[in-house]
Amino acid sequence: MKTMESVRLISGSAHPQFAELLSKGMNIELSKCESKHFLNGETSVILGESVRSASVYIIQPTCSPNVNDNIMELLVLVDAVRRASSKHITAVIPFFGYGKQNKKEKSREPITGKLIANLIETSGVDRVISMDLEASQIQGFFNIPVDNLYAEPLIVKYIEKHYKHLGEKVVISPAVDGVKRAKLVSDKLNCDLAILDRQTKGDKEDMILVGDVSGKVAIIIGSIADTCETLALSAKILKSKGATNVFALVSHGELSGNAIETLNNSELEELVITNSIPQTEKSKQCPKLKIINVTPMFCEALKRIIHGESITAASSKFVIL
């Protein structure tokens, strides 16, 4: 059994705020590490203290706006830690970039998610901890343990706390392939489930609603909010079908491009995301945006791994799939 004295936490530059919260929750100081980019675009890291014979946890979501740089920095950090004679390396990746590219949609396409998994594993990582991977098969892309934490319990608690007084609810899956995630929430809330089937005909995009939302509070459950265009279209259709209010809760908020403007101009009452991805000051000032802190869930998982305890759903405060 490992002790906290043999554990090191190292933060990449992708999300230092997340690493700080994790450090406080674990009561372990972040190890010194300098990361920089040369003018030619190359990445360099220097460890500021010994990690010899230590179990090292590298905290680095591979997220936007610099997803490729963040991936490269993670690989370089892992190589530096491995060459410094660490005992065990865990990559803590709250958001796994390229997760959408997990299968071939057309012929002659790559499966980039698998390529990223290969790179991470080959660099020397012994274990990966992530949250709400875009597809379950991503765990199978690795030949090392992958712990996929699930934010559903925190999302359910948020709904119960903030939307309890609003009346009858219906949970919405904004896509057919997200039904399983949405059903987990609807079962916990003991409410109906409806599905929005996204259809594209030429340049025109539309959604077909399967289910009844008339006179109900519609709660969209999704995985990633990127441009927010799908969420905005979903809210418009749900309101046109008689929904009294429309809220959206998603695991990861990339909020790319004009996402904030799209959100502000949409019929969504509120968009709730987690802090798996850092947000810009512009995003933080958006009145419709709310953020759930998931670092306590990661702290619990890390503590159980360090002490050799189970982190299955039956014995933990959170869900892992």
From Swiss-Prot:
Disulfide bonds: none annotated. Pathway: Metabolic intermediate biosynthesis; 5-phospho-alpha-D-ribose 1-diphosphate biosynthesis; 5-phospho-alpha-D-ribose 1-diphosphate from D-ribose 5-phosphate (route I): step 1/1. Residues 214-229 are annotated as: Binding of phosphoribosylpyrophosphate. Mg(2+) binds at D132, D147. Its cofactor is Mg(2+). It is found in: Cytoplasm. It catalyses: D-ribose 5-phosphate + ATP = 5-phospho-alpha-D-ribose 1-diphosphate + AMP + H(+). It comes from the Eukaryota. Transmembrane segments: none annotated. CDD domains: PRTases_typeI. Gene3D superfamilies: 3.40.50.2020. Keywords: ATP-binding, Cytoplasm, Kinase, Magnesium, Metal-binding, Nucleotide biosynthesis, Nucleotide-binding, Transferase. GO terms for cellular component: cytoplasm; ribose phosphate diphosphokinase complex. GO terms for biological process: 5-phosphoribose 1-diphosphate biosynthetic process; purine nucleotide biosynthetic process. GO terms for molecular function: ATP binding; kinase activity; magnesium ion binding; ribose phosphate diphosphokinase activity. It is an enzyme of class 2 (transferase). Its EC number is 2.7.6.1. Belongs to the ribose-phosphate pyrophosphokinase family. This is Ribose-phosphate pyrophosphokinase C. The lineage of its organism: Eukaryota, Amoebozoa, Evosea, Eumycetozoa, Dictyostelia. The gene is prsC.
